[in-house]
Amino acid sequence: MRECISIHIGQAGIQVGNACWELYCLEHGIQPDGQMPGDKTVGGGDDAFNTFFSETGAGKHVPRAVFVDLEPTVIDEVRTGAYRQLFHPEQLISGKEDAANNFARGHYTIGKEIVDLCLDRIRKLSDNCTGLQGFLVFNAVGGGTGSGLGSLLLERLSVDYGRKSKLGFTVYPSPQVSTSVVEPYNSVLSTHSLLEHTDVSILLDNEAIYDICRRSLDIERPTYTNLNRLVSQVISSLTASLRFDGALNVDVNEFQTNLVPYPRIHFMLSSYAPVISAEKAYHEQLSVAEITNSAFEPSSMMAKCDPRHGKYMACCLMYRGDVVPKDVNAAVATIKTKRTIQFVDWCPTGFKCGINYQPPGVVPGGDLAKVQRAVCMISNSTSVVEVFSRIDHKFDLMYAKRAFVHWYVGEGMEEGEFSEAREDLAALEKDYEEVGAEFDEGEDGDEGDEY
């Protein structure tokens, strides 16, 4: 088996996790108490969904997941929520006092007390796997726990499970919507370790997802539940090929192989289509070509950056539902002829496609319509650098005055870590610039000849 262990850190990680596990359960027909009436092989078996769920002798399906937070309120919601019987109590780890939006508390003072317990639980889960494939890590980098404890856990996972791939689903601060003043500090410090300790990192930001909810689902005031349900569709599409059998399956390691040209250039944009409300879906049926086009629309991107400002290095299209390879090839061929979608010249093919015949599931009473086919795109584009340069700029404004720095130093950090992390990000911006600029040397007028 190729099992994956999910690790949900901090409030954002846990709430996205709730949405994901709810959706997985619906897709596999697993009840909130973990029973699965449709499962023929009780107590084990080699079903595809066993990559994400382990089975007990009594036929209960338990998620291979750990939820960690430094304060109890968010995890208590899981403990008392609809899916409380699904999780093993040991999988829900909460501390007593939170990180107070402070990276240093999450990484040094409070975080280090809880990190061994987490690793112990993760070790138990991994002992339960026959062929652990890797980790999916969910966190946000604006707060204290997601950024501080998140990077601490990633660092320790690298030590304990060096060769296993780590996929990060990371919520980055939005340009306009901010939840804390020190977001830029936490993000920069955290990205410093994401750079080294994740293999692929998928960037999400709330503002972009708010806009998608407003525009495509006509929700005037989207809540976090609305956002998380949309994010969970993306994550479900990515992991569908691990959980179901399909025509063109995609392994976790394949993301890395196909999307990451250089180790540091591993921050991805994601988009999902069709995002469509039930009222609209009733009247229209979307073709493969249409959903593929809308996945490339700048407005579909789940992070606030415009792919037209950069070049694509590679992208991965995961289709699910009623889709055949012939349609996919035609849709991709059309995309390649578009002048607005530019690829770097050293990566002429640039497309990795996966097809899964299981149609996308939806949460009953949710906002998304049940559709016959959907596509999720993960793309590596040089425009991601916009996300970093925005955060770096805000970081510089605050750090020039050393504002709020004493809170970090007081928790045992050194000021040098700030400048070290900031330099690392400056180097990252430069890396992206070089990767995108490699073709301006010899070609001035004939950029279109790579097709």
From Swiss-Prot:
EC top class, as a word: hydrolase
Compartmental location: Cytoplasm, Cytoskeleton
Keyword Disulfide bond attached: no
Stored InterPro entries: Alpha_tubulin (IPR002452), Tub_FtsZ_C (IPR008280), Tubulin (IPR000217), Tubulin/FtsZ-like_C (IPR037103), Tubulin/FtsZ_2-layer-sand-dom (IPR018316), Tubulin/FtsZ_GTPase_sf (IPR036525), Tubulin_C (IPR023123), Tubulin_CS (IPR017975)
EC numbers for this chain: 3.6.5.-
Active-site residues, record numbering mapped to chain: E254
PTM annotation (N6-acetyllysine): residues: K40
Chief subcellular location: cytoplasm
Cofactor: Mg(2+)
Binding residue positions for Mg(2+): E71
Stored PROSITE patterns: TUBULIN
The record's account of how the chain is modified after translation: Undergoes a tyrosination/detyrosination cycle, the cyclic removal and re-addition of a C-terminal tyrosine residue by the enzymes tubulin tyrosine carboxypeptidase (TTCP) and tubulin tyrosine ligase (TTL), respectively. Acetylation of alpha chains at Lys-40 stabilizes microtubules and affects affinity and processivity of microtubule motors. This modification has a role in multiple cellular functions, ranging from cell motility, cell cycle progression or cell differentiation to intracellular trafficking and signaling.
Entry GO terms, CC: cytoplasm; microtubule
Keywords attached to this entry: Acetylation, Cytoplasm, Cytoskeleton, GTP-binding, Hydrolase, Magnesium, Metal-binding, Microtubule, Nucleotide-binding
Annotated SUPFAM superfamilies: Tubulin C-terminal domain-like, Tubulin nucleotide-binding domain-like
Family (UniProt): Belongs to the tubulin family.
Function: Tubulin is the major constituent of microtubules, a cylinder consisting of laterally associated linear protofilaments composed of alpha- and beta-tubulin heterodimers. Microtubules grow by the addition of GTP-tubulin dimers to the microtubule end, where a stabilizing cap forms. Below the cap, tubulin dimers are in GDP-bound state, owing to GTPase activity of alpha-tubulin.
Stated name of the protein: Tubulin alpha chain
Organism whose genome encodes this protein: Triticum aestivum (Wheat)
Gene: TUBA
